[in-house]
Amino acid sequence: RSSRRVMARKVPLGTRAEVTQVVEHRHTLAALDPKFPPVLATPWMIGRMEGACYRAQEPFCDVGETTVGTAIHVDHRAPTTIGQTVVAEAVLEKIDGRFFIYRVSARNGQHPIGSGTVHRAIVNVAKFMEKVRGT
């Protein structure tokens, strides 16, 4: 527990990172079902947002620690087509113990396509995996 508190103090508010993704067919709704249009699927956008959060925080994790998502509140407001580049950004807004709240956004070029918050928690990887396995 003490390492979590120490880490929480080490991560400065405003810490930010970006993840870039060129949209391919496999990232689209059409890859899930051909009835859908070939535009970026919301889960892929959210995945890039979570990736940006992870990239921002991982350098501050102690050995044996990582972060996992605990809540996502995101709006997906505009389509992105195959070949366009999506940039997802995360900025650390708040720390509450071992929980971290990131303001996230995504854009294609200069056009915003989504925004919201992603909450992440610090976990000890070994203990987390024990819990996952039910041991």
Regions found by a protein language model. Give the residues of each.
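Short, Lys/Arg-enriched N-terminal segments with co-localized hydrophobic residues
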Residues: 1-6
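HotDog/MaoC-like acyl-thioester-processing domains
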Residues: 81-82, 91-135
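Hydrophobic beta-strand-centered segment that forms part of the acyl-chain substrate-binding groove
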Residues: 53-87
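Catalytic strand-loop segment that frames the active site of acyl-thioester-processing enzymes
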Residues: 8-42
